[in-house]
């Protein structure tokens, strides 16, 4: 077993003001594994979890040391925003599609919202698994403060059966 395989999944369970319990992950691998496991357990249409992490391209540039991440890596940097958008489209969403066993998902509902403090991308798609229709909503936020990225993943059933 390699050192990477032994990596402990960093996760916290928090309770929102609405009384909902949400798992908050600190690494992409644990987040994707959780979604895949919940899909296997048929809990795919009532899921809410979050991911707060430094994207792999940021860690690569800092030689895997969060202390060495450039202060310029934030929502005010065009280069950071461009690379983050590529990471979301080519890696994060692709990995989510694989985790929910729906590689054909297209995330047709796309939007981007920019303010001085942050940039938010919204992705949504209705799909079906085991004959149960549900909607996936993914929100990705980066702020002007640092390179930390916040992902909010929610699924809910669609229509009354």
UniProtKB/Swiss-Prot annotation:
<dbReference type="GO" id="GO:0071944">
    <property type="term" value="C:cell periphery"/>
</dbReference>
<dbReference type="Pfam" id="PF10843">
    <property type="entry name" value="RGI1"/>
</dbReference>
<dbReference type="GO" id="GO:0006112">
    <property type="term" value="P:energy reserve metabolic process"/>
</dbReference>
<keyword id="KW-1003">Cell membrane</keyword>
<comment type="similarity">
    <text>Belongs to the RGI1 family.</text>
</comment>
<keyword id="KW-0472">Membrane</keyword>
<feature type="cross-link" description="Glycyl lysine isopeptide (Lys-Gly) (interchain with G-Cter in ubiquitin)">
    <location>
        <position position="68"/>
    </location>
</feature>
<comment type="function">
    <text>Involved in the control of energetic metabolism and significantly contribute to cell fitness, especially under respiratory growth conditions.</text>
</comment>
<keyword id="KW-0832">Ubl conjugation</keyword>
<dbReference type="InterPro" id="IPR022554">
    <property type="entry name" value="RGI1"/>
</dbReference>
<keyword id="KW-1017">Isopeptide bond</keyword>
<protein>
    <recommendedName>
        <fullName>Respiratory growth induced protein 1</fullName>
    </recommendedName>
</protein>
<dbReference type="GO" id="GO:0005737">
    <property type="term" value="C:cytoplasm"/>
</dbReference>
<dbReference type="GO" id="GO:0005634">
    <property type="term" value="C:nucleus"/>
</dbReference>
<dbReference type="InterPro" id="IPR038235">
    <property type="entry name" value="RGI1_sf"/>
</dbReference>
<dbReference type="GO" id="GO:0005886">
    <property type="term" value="C:plasma membrane"/>
</dbReference>
């Amino acid at each position: 077993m390699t050192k990477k395989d032994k990596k402990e999944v960093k996760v916290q369970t928090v309770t929102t003001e609405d009384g909902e319990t949400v798992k908050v992950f600190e690494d992409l691998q644990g987040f994707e594994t959780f979604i895949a496991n919940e899909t296997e357990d048929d809990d795919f249409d009532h899921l809410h979890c979050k991911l707060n992490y430094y994207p792999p391209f940021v860690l690569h540039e800092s030689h895997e040391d969060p202390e060495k991440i450039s202060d310029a890596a934030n929502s005010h940097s065009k280069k950071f925003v461009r690379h983050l958008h590529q990471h979301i489209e080519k890696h994060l969403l692709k990995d989510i599609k694989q985790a929910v066993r729906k590689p054909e998902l297209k995330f047709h509902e796309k939007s981007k919202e920019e303010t001085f403090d942050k940039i938010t991308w919204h992705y949504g798609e209705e799909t079906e698994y085991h004959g149960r229709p549900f909607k996936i909503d993914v929100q990705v936020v980066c702020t002007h403060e640092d390179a930390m990225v916040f992902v909010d993943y929610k699924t809910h059933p669609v229509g009354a059966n």
